[in-house]
């Protein structure tokens, strides 16, 4: 089974910690985990699979030799670091609102259109939390009776 080199950007925040928990819970095969955070949090540790992993400062040079970067930072920092992540060849899965409306960046909800991620776009965005919850219900209804249009 292939193992992945994954960075979690914003690893010490609530969303970053949840990303680490999900990687562990779903037993995602990780060969290298790189927790990244602000200079203030660098040097602290995060618990992953029973090990304390040192947190490094998020900086452009940190994105080398990675398969995926999971972003749990604000839009400004996300936009700032995106070019370096893309240059590295890693897929950037961003949780901020930075790229949600950008043409060519797929908005992916795994349970609904997760197959779109298989083409390995350089950046993947997710809709905001309210939209995701609404789409989960709408997708279930759509499977029962195709919805032609929706007005919000």
Q: Model regions: which residues?
A:
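N-terminal Rossmann-like NAD(P) cofactor-binding subdomain of oxidoreductases
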Residues: 1-151
